[in-house]
Amino acid sequence: MRTRNNLYKKLYSKKSHRFLTTKVRHSRQNDIDNRKIVWHAIASFYLDTELLEYDYERIAALFTQSGFSITELKKIDLYEVFPVLKDNLLTISGVWNGIDEGWLNKACTLTYYRRNNNFFRMKVRFYNRVLYTMRKEHWIKIESIMRSKTTPQIPINSNLIENS
């Protein structure tokens, strides 16, 4: 077994016959841990309840703290959360009181590993063409809140207004 620049020790898995470096395994786990909060925030788009302004503010704050760009957040929604929760958009009596965290973490982790598969991506984009309208309003509100938070607010000096 040859290592690149002898930096990382390769690990061999007999079951899968794949080589993974220690660094890759840890970076994937860190990436998944960072995404869990985002998965739970995005999951509220799929509940059968109406989100209030407070909910959008909370979700936008979580998205801002996550460090992901809006484009990355939309990709996380499309390829990691949407495949898991799209059925809740289709059912007449969908889940409305919340989604089990453990189940959501496991299911989204599986789709995280499948997200680069071309067939998987094609299938998800097909369903998304039909169902995106059900999530579009959420993303529009979140984007506007995130833009307003990042745009610097210029304070108005009342003395300047009075003197003119």
Label every model-predicted segment:
Residues T3, D55, I99-D100:
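Poly-acidic low-complexity segments
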Residues R2-R4, R18:
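Basic polycationic patches enriched in arginine
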Residues R28-L62:
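Short terminal alpha-helical segments
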Residues L11-D33, A60-S164:
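Small-residue-enriched hydrophobic alpha-helices in membranes
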